[in-house]
């Protein structure tokens, strides 16, 4: 678990152009915190503790402005730079070493009006 956290911090340092060090990541990067919440919530989701998992992610959303469904599958070293408005749905599958920016929505499965 701690190795994963260290790798995630290192990934943010490498891909975040404004990051000055690990302490700044831990104190000031919402991406780091939303992923801490998501890892716990996803574990709970897989064990069918779904209301608790949803509640944890709602708290994370209020604190970070980033909305991630606890059922979403997210790989290692995931980084959201300027995460306000990011929405990741239940069906999203994100691999390792992925970076997202503000305003991205992933995971919708229902077709929109007038879509092909």
Please describe what each predicted stretch is.
Residues 1-64:
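Terminal amphipathic alpha-helical/low-complexity segments used for targeting or macromolecular assembly
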Residues 46-116:
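Flexible, glycine/small-residue-enriched loop-and-beta-strand segment within the central core
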């Amino acid at each position: 678990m701690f190795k994963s956290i260290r790798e995630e911090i290192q990934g943010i340092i490498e891909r975040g152009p404004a990051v000055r060090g690990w302490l700044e990541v831990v104190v000031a990067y919402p991406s780091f915190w939303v992923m801490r919440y998501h890892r716990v919530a996803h574990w709970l989701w897989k064990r069918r503790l779904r209301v608790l998992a949803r509640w944890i992610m709602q708290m994370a959303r209020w604190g970070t402005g980033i909305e991630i469904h606890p059922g979403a599958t997210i790989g290692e070293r995931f980084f959201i730079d300027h995460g306000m408005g990011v929405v990741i749905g239940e069906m999203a599958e994100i691999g390792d070493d992925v970076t997202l920016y503000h305003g991205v929505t992933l995971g919708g499965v229902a077709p929109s009006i007038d879509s092909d």
